[in-house]
Amino acid sequence: MADPRDKALQDYRKKLLEHKEIDGRLKELREQLKELTKQYEKSENDLKALQSVGQIVGEVLKQLTEEKFIVKATNGPRYVVGCRRQLDKSKLKPGTRVALDMTTLTIMRYLPREVDPLVYNMSHEDPGNVSYSEIGGLSEQIRELREVIELPLTNPELFQRVGIIPPKGCLLYGPPGTGKTLLARAVASQLDCNFLKVVSSSIVDKYIGESARLIREMFNYARDHQPCIIFMDEIDAIGGRRFSEGTSADREIQRTLMELLNQMDGFDTLHRVKMIMATNRPDTLDPALLRPGRLDRKIHIDLPNEQARLDILKIHAGPITKHGEIDYEAIVKLSDGFNGADLRNVCTEAGMFAIRADHDFVVQEDFMKAVRKVADSKKLESKLDYKPV
């Protein structure tokens, strides 16, 4: 009796294993079927898109009733048209770009605002991965900048509790090479927000009204992509003091400045758009640009003192391959009047001296030679007296 029973048990185990194996294969096949169904649907949608007729780009002028809108097509004429049921009609405000059906001219979908290629390029400027620890000797300036730019974007409720309006922007001013652009890059890389880097001289256009239009589009883009930081470098290119005499080119720059002033403090508020401006010549800027309400805080970034120079030198010398003890304090004592860029140049020159000596490392003597060489070239520079603004 035992043999048939054992045989039956063995058959049962065998069938059970086969069942598990088939069940596993069935699950795999179901996953494959799911994936293939997705691919099929995507291919079908792509095929429909290829076969479908194109659409006309238009602009909403006015809403007549709940279902009817006046739109202007790009080819000129105006039409009273309907709208797809699935669309949120509250978004169809005057000025909204929409796609119209070729035959019925029904509003099929809304389109994003048209962006100038220059503004689009500004938004794709990568600030890089810069941390505050990489900036030496500017702890007070970093604190002031973060209070104005970072705090209103990350903790706006603090300002609501106290009952004050958050600052709109700040001006970074000081001698060249002191880290103004680096500070702005650090703020942008530490915050999860959009960043527009604008070189002010690139805004100026030879055609009347084009520069002001670019400023408008830049601020419209920033408002559509909040939170956003606009960093305008070398603001003295368009923010110079206004005067009555001048050529037509000067008047065009003044019109650009007036558009900038209007966008910064006009009827249309900036909300979560923050401004950082940088310049080497604060004395040439227009008083209307500097007033509170536009640039609420002016941060002076002066030449670093001895302790700050020591911090900066250690940061720049960190990645360098060194041999033996390096006396940073002795190097810093010879670097009176140096800015951050000069101290980085000292490290580069020290590396060049090591390469010239056919070494794979830098020694103390290389740094001493480099700091003397940079000090000699500094004598050629002219100095500006930076008064507080």
From Swiss-Prot:
Any single Gene Ontology cellular-component annotation: proteasome complex
PROSITE patterns hit by this protein: AAA
Keyword DNA-binding: no
GO molecular function, one term: ATP hydrolysis activity
GO biological process: ERAD pathway; positive regulation of inclusion body assembly; positive regulation of proteasomal protein catabolic process; positive regulation of RNA polymerase II transcription preinitiation complex assembly; proteasome-mediated ubiquitin-dependent protein catabolic process
InterPro entries: 26S_Proteasome_ATPase, AAA+_ATPase, AAA_lid_3, ATPase_AAA_core, ATPase_AAA_CS, NA-bd_OB-fold, P-loop_NTPase, Prot_ATP_ID_OB_2nd
Annotated positions of the Phosphoserine modification: 244
TM spans (from-to): none
Pfam families: AAA (PF00004), AAA_lid_3 (PF17862), Prot_ATP_ID_OB_C (PF16450)
Residues with the N6-acetyllysine modification: 72, 206
Keywords for the protein's UniProt record, in alphabetical order: Acetylation, ATP-binding, Cytoplasm, Nucleotide-binding, Nucleus, Phosphoprotein, Proteasome
Record: residues binding ATP: 174-181
Main location: cytoplasm
Phosphoprotein is among the record's keywords: yes
Subcellular location, record wording: Cytoplasm; Nucleus
Xref: CDD domains: RecA-like_PAN_like
Domain of life: Eukaryota
Subunit structure comment from the entry: Component of the 19S proteasome regulatory particle complex. The 26S proteasome consists of a 20S core particle (CP) and two 19S regulatory subunits (RP). The regulatory particle is made of a lid composed of 9 subunits, a base containing 6 ATPases including PSMC6 and few additional components. Interacts with PAAF1.
Family to which this protein belongs: Belongs to the AAA ATPase family.
Function: Component of the 26S proteasome, a multiprotein complex involved in the ATP-dependent degradation of ubiquitinated proteins. This complex plays a key role in the maintenance of protein homeostasis by removing misfolded or damaged proteins, which could impair cellular functions, and by removing proteins whose functions are no longer required. Therefore, the proteasome participates in numerous cellular processes, including cell cycle progression, apoptosis, or DNA damage repair.
PANTHER family per UniProt: 26S PROTEASOME REGULATORY SUBUNIT
The name this protein goes by in its record: 26S proteasome regulatory subunit 10B
Organism: Homo sapiens (Human)
Gene this protein is translated from: PSMC6
